[in-house]
Amino acid sequence: MSEQIKTNGVTLILKKASVKNTIAMPDFIFDHKMYYNPAEFAWKYIGGTWKMPILWRLNKATLRYSELKKTLPHIKHKVLSSQLKELEESGLISKKIYAEVPPKTEYAITEKGKETIPVIEIIRNYGLKLMEEKGINVNLKK
C-alpha cells in the first residue's frame, strides 16, 4: 500500500513500512526521473569520480581552474570543465570571473557546498576502512 504526495514538482511515493521504527526511504520522481531513495538523489549531486575531490579541495581554498587542475592530475580538461559546471548549476560552488587581462576565473565552495563536506568525510573514512580491509595501502596526503 502506498500514498503519493506532490510537492514542489516532486512526486513522493510513500510506502507503508512493514518493520516498525524504520527510517523512510521514499521513492519519488524529480525532473522526469524515478529515484528509489533520498541517498540516490543526493548522489546525483555529489557522486561520480570527480565531484567529491573537487568539493574537498575547494573547501580548503578558493582556486583558479589551473590550480584545481594541478591538484587533480588525472582528470581531463573537458571532464573538469563539465564537473565544475554541474557543481555550479547545483549551487555547490561559485564561479567568479575577473575582468582583467589575462582573464582570471576563481572557483569557491558555497555554504550549500560546505554542507556536503561532513558527508564526503564519512564516505572517505568508510572507503579508507574498506581499503584497509582489502590490504590496499595508500600514502595519504594531508
Where are these regions (language model features)?
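Amphipathic alpha-helical dimerization/coiled-coil segments
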Residues: E3-P26, M34, W56, K114-K142
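Short hydrophobic/aromatic-rich motifs at helix boundaries and adjacent loops
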Residues: I23-D27, Y36-E40, L55-W56, G91-K95, ...
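Short, intrinsically disordered/low-complexity patches at protein termini
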Residues: I75-K78, E88-S90, K104, P118-V119, ...
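Generic recognition of well-ordered alpha-helical segments
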Residues: F41, K70, S82, P118-E121, ...
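Basic, amphipathic "hinge/linker" alpha-helix immediately C-terminal to the N-terminal HTH DNA-binding motif
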Residues: A99-I123
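Generic structural signal for secondary-structure transition and capping sites
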Residues: K51, L63, L92, N125-L128
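Canonical helix-turn-helix DNA-binding module
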Residues: S66-Y98, P102
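N-terminal helix-turn-helix DNA-binding core of bacterial DNA-binding proteins
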Residues: F30-V79, E106
